Amino acid sequence: MTSATPTTATTTHRRRRVARKPVVGSLAAAVVLAGAWYATATATPAPKAATTGLTVTNTTVSLGAKFPYLSAGYNNTREWTRTATAAAPDGTLRVAWPASDGIHVTPLTKAGKRSGADTVVKGAKEVGGLVAHNDGFALLTRVSDSNKWKETTAALVRYKNGKQAFRTKLTGTSSHDTAPLLDGQLGWNGKKYGAYFVVHGAGGFADGHFGDKMAYVSSKGAKQSGGWGWGCSHNEGIALRAESTGAFTSLCFDDWRSGLFVSTGIGAPDNAPVVQREQCWAGYCGGTFAGRTGELVKSSSGRYATAFASRGAASAAKNPDDASGRGWTVKPKTKTHQVAVAFLKNRNTPAGKPVYLTSTAGTEHVNVHVAPYGKDRLLVSWESLKNAKCANGTCTGTFTGTHLRLIDWNGKFKTPDKVVKARIAGDIAVLADGSLTWAYAPVTPSYTTALTGASPTTKTLRIARLER
């Protein structure tokens, strides 16, 4: 395997005052827990869709290390550990996934088959975003650092032809920030990278608080102008899309103003455009992207779409007890999360209220994703849990399937739900012909209990493909 220079691993944790934590315990053989998700190497392939044409095919890739495929969310809810799949201009693929020795980037052919040994970014923590190049990749991740909190720093790492070309740290002592987690996104417009991620104040005006940061980096690893050092408060969810010119389009879930906001080029100040109000507090938001990293899809006419799990807002008003005048109090509309799709007129302006694709009160909806599907349709995916039992903002329930549905750019259904056996566990890559591909662990989900202890592991990934 090709490896980066080893770095000393640091203890990782989620934000302070937050129940959400990564599972970083022993990565020995799969831990069998009551209600755990079990690796099922012999899982059957997804059935063909007779009416919608949404047929998911799978290729199995063997891994050289154990992949801990679960993470604990708020209240230790079960979440997929993020993988990132990206397509290079020549059509080949890269898949990034974490292991005990660092972040592995697996090279694949256009057909989704392994084409070589993994590149291992030694000591790196967390897949924060991935860009595939013909000669390698760029990875947003966390690496060890020296700071007052003894936390990791955000870093953009570029590999060319199996060797590290640069490693640019994006937080540090001079900027008074660290990155104990990223929940990030990475974009590339052919000239520069845009990295959007969570930061922890380490000195200065924001000492001890959590916010977010947008940083631009050149193709050679030099920091560029633009972006911001402190934006959305306690960012609870990030979406980013690269643009050929100007600021990259971005969204964030903010706990203080309680909801989803446009942060494009402005870092989400008090007057940031509101996409949706949600009940949020430090470490939690009733509206959420899958794993707190969402997708932004752009239409040919310049509109945008994003999808998220939402509890909605029965009421929303400024908090009279907040002397800053910035805080909001939101009462959620539902106990369970429903599937919402929101649209923007352009990179700065929301287009009306979100459209809800589900409305069943007793069913919880998680792991919501959206991707382009052809010229004028969107693929929305989610997982459903029946007989939901909810407390303190999160729910458990009985898993009933992964749903695929096509909608148009007005949110109107173009197909009924199609329940498939594949899962979506991270970033989706769009291929040159419009087909979609992603990586996921071959496991049977269970959401009936919270996740405690270390994550179970697998040594295989499924590479799913959905033809356009």
Cite the ranges covered by each PLM segment.
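Short linear sequence motifs
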Residues: A30-V31, V297
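Extracellular, repeat-based ectodomains that mediate carbohydrate processing or recognition
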Residues: P47-R468
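N-terminal export and membrane-targeting signals
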Residues: T8-A29
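C-terminal region of N-terminal signal peptides and the immediate post-cleavage residues
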Residues: R14-V18, A34-A50
